[in-house]
């Protein structure tokens, strides 16, 4: 027996007699069978090879409108800039091309464009590394043409997150203001090119939603948020504030947005649905538009021609106002896209609208709006790639199922279902899709018409995996009730009948792979068990020699001889959520709890194998899959709700 890396954290033991390797997760042994052809030459001391291929971020699906604002702008290059997860996206709609700024290491929360329309600032939240080291919140100033980082501000200064950022609009835009999410919501002003703080001041105990400079007077700033609006003066290195006085006007719970009109008037929109005009330089209301929206006014945008556009929350309306604050035109955003979060001026009379349901729309108040960027709204776990097309499916907590084209980057179709979804799998014909939900219900959908073909219920816990056998004759449904339900499949996936259930795991089912010849399948469970099953009898296969040399059609199980090298030292067994092997059998991609995507060579059977590592997601990466032709890999984010498409090169 030779052993490797003896230590409390993770020991790997190779037994030649048993033809197995044993690793330990949380002190629990996980024995894995070595195929006969590898056993004679296998050694734990062989160095793993880095894959010659790399991943390059190709497309980002999604937008963060749910809880961020003023984060969508059109640049002179024709690109719209916005963010999701830890990626700032520059999307050229005409060329159908994206570029990505990847300087951040956790969620981006705010974005500002410099008056030069090239320089961009983005602020991020505090994060932690895999080792538990804090990653401090900060602001990055970068060049949108070269994507190079110019300056990093505020490391060790900001607390929790940077929630607002803005450049001064006059004086060459040489100042930048930022607000953090500390208890005092500190407003700070920076000479960003020198990376030096000019001054800071406690802003408010309550949430601050906007901080901005006056367009012509660089010594004036405005902040607003929960039950306040402040007018700030910056003089001789100190900040002084005057509170906005509502006097006889209804004081709103939240002042949600602010913009400036040509004459110097300040306009605010609030949670009461009112627009207030604050006379130039003053802190008093000089005009009001009551009930401009039913529900909050979430967005304001002053247009080039001096008119004003507002966007509504509950009423989902985009309204164009004349110079006398009379309503000129209005249009409602379709309900599926959700309330308006932010509005940006496009070319001509076009507008870009970001919504709280993480969509970006393009259109005008005259013509209405159509979808430009579709996003998921809540945690995303289900991912499956089509067996013979450049398409994939995502589904999640938001009860939405999207079938995407990886080439057009748009949904081919979308449908809502009754329960939050957790898993997905295509029939080998590609004509039927299974979707597992958190309630024990699972559905079969027609992939052409997206019609419901059938609905079944197994147990009352979440269905973590739905997987058709390679020959299309069986469907295995793995549940959090520790059972795998096996169905026979007819009519190309349209008719299923329950054959039996596989009982033997003492914890919930996490992953499942079929044999290439469909004669058996293997499962992983929440307590790191690997079991093998005969679908015909639904009985466990206990003879090691029966399964040792099986060729597996896929490698999605995170525990097994071919993949155990993905586990880092000290891993606790829940750190890696998903793994996928390329169809050509050369690459393996893993998705972890630290926002990272790793690319390994396959088989990955040396302890702590070498990998290329990629950021972009900002919370746990929940799933990973290769497109049918291995040209792209796809990863899904948990809390960041994004889908990242990686080119394999």
Curated annotation (Swiss-Prot):
The keyword Ribosomal protein does not apply. One of its GO terms (biological process) is regulation of microtubule nucleation. GO terms for cellular component: cytoplasm; microtubule; mitotic spindle. WD repeats lie at residues 56-93, 97-144, 151-192, 195-234, 241-280, 285-323, 369-406, 410-447, 452-489, 495-535, 564-602, 609-648. GO terms for molecular function: microtubule binding; tubulin binding. Residues 10-649 are annotated as: Tandem atypical propeller in EMLs. It is found in: Cytoplasm, Cytoskeleton; Cytoplasm, Cytoskeleton, Spindle. Pfam families: Beta-prop_EML, Beta-prop_EML_2, HELP. SUPFAM superfamilies: Quinoprotein alcohol dehydrogenase-like (SSF50998). Disulfide bonds: none annotated. Keywords: Coiled coil, Cytoplasm, Cytoskeleton, Microtubule, Repeat, WD repeat. It comes from the Eukaryota. Tubulin binding protein that inhibits microtubule nucleation and growth, resulting in shorter microtubules. Belongs to the WD repeat EMAP family. Interacts with GRID2 and may also interact with GRID1. Interacts with EML3. Binds unpolymerized tubulins via its WD repeat region. This is Echinoderm microtubule-associated protein-like 2. It comes from Mus musculus. The gene is Eml2.
